[in-house]
Amino acid sequence: MKVLFLNTRKKRIDCGTLLRIGRRPDVIVLAELLQGSQRHYEAGLASAGYENCSQAAFHSRKRHLRVYSKLKLETDTRFSRQGNKLQNNWVRCRIKGVTISAVHMPTLGMKRKPFNQLKPWMSKQGACRALMIGDFNTDPAQDPKWGPQLIEWVNDFGWRNLWDKASGGTKAYTFKGTRKSDKPRRIDHAFVGKRLPKARLIHLPAFRLKGLSDHSGLLVVL
């Protein structure tokens, strides 16, 4: 099973291009979708055989997460919303025996509650068939508080950081803003539990290099 994550930055990427650069994954998780782009991706991906598995949204939030899948979801209670800070920004589902948790963290001073909500879930799922993927808005090398905290939880709870063996090593980054003062950062991450020992990460910078988003895509092969 292949799972693609991409922060679209509210852009409407041609779905054929999305699938080609994303190497035709089985499951697609997209972040930062306005209502218009939600309709764009739902229609375009439906024609390619993907079902919009997410609950309906009645209002527009820039960090909406949406899950599109060619594979059947194994649970009816698919998604959880965890408090105001992660409402609509944390979705969980189970596909082919794997729990997929997709996250889009807030920025700056709004991270404390969301990270504290992630901690107990991470502690329970580290020994399981679980994938945690998304835009954490946290570069471990540049965020002095939450970067080390995230990596500490990953290590303490038995998760594996898929960046450790990904192409590009420590020099790879996933985000570069448009302002001159913006530094390249690795803020998109993928972690797997102990029962997914063969999982690997493929970094897809073409989304960023071609101007389709200012984020790279992450493709996890399970």
Locate each region found by the language model:
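Acidic/histidine-rich, metal-coordinating catalytic segments
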Residues: 128-142
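N-terminal, active-site-proximal structural segment of metallo-dependent hydrolase catalytic domains
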Residues: 1-47, 62-63
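Catalytic metal-binding/acid-base residues of hydrolase active sites
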Residues: 9, 34, 104-106, 136-139, ...
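Structured beta-strand-rich core segments of catalytic domains in phosphoester-bond hydrolases
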Residues: 32-105
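Active-site neighborhood of phospho(di)ester-bond hydrolases with catalytic His/Asp-centered motifs
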Residues: 28-32, 54-55, 131-135, 161-165
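Active-site-proximal beta-strand elements of phosphoester/diester hydrolases
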Residues: 1-10, 92, 96-107, 133
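Surface polyanion/phosphate-binding segment centered on an Asp-His-Pro turn
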Residues: 208-222
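Active site of divalent-metal-dependent phosphoester/diester hydrolases
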Residues: 51-70, 140-198, 202-212
